Amino acid sequence: MKIGRMEGMTGMAGRAAVVAALLLMPAALLAQQQSGIEITTAATVEVLQKNEKGEKVAVQKDLTAAKVVPGDAVTFTLTYANRGKQPATNVTVVDPVPEHLAYVDGSAQGTGTRIEFSVDGGRTYGTPDKLTVTGGDGKVRPAQGPDYTHIRWTVLAPLAAGGSGTVSFKAKVK
């Protein structure tokens, strides 16, 4: 999923375009779904609001109700569920890091899953310690969060009929 280019967009129009583009992202765009596996996604952003005492507190807001600007961190939460009548094996969830956002190192979560990343558009995956990229200077270096293009979670145990789980990650607006 590619978010439209933001060059030339300023103020509310630019922020609204980013929000609108993020909301158009279907749940787990590249999820490798098995028969009976349903995947949904939600995106939230942390905003500062005043509480009843007038103090500023951080609150998670659904992306539909919030504006985002460069530097804001968006949390993507994907829920997977086995709607089939049998246990599901080899359940894999793949989600792209949207263009104009950069993955926040160490933010991917998923209890009972193996988490791998791609730096080549989802063609290959590996753990962070094994991924490299070629820098602008032509030298190979270890990949970092902003280099990741996709995240893959592999559920390690069979997912029981009616069972579900969640995975998540954060990405900052560039």
Segments from the language model and where they lie:
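Exported/extracytosolic protein signature
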Residues: 2-3, 29-174
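Bacterial N-terminal signal peptides that target proteins for export
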Residues: 2-18
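Bacterial N-terminal signal peptides
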Residues: 15-27
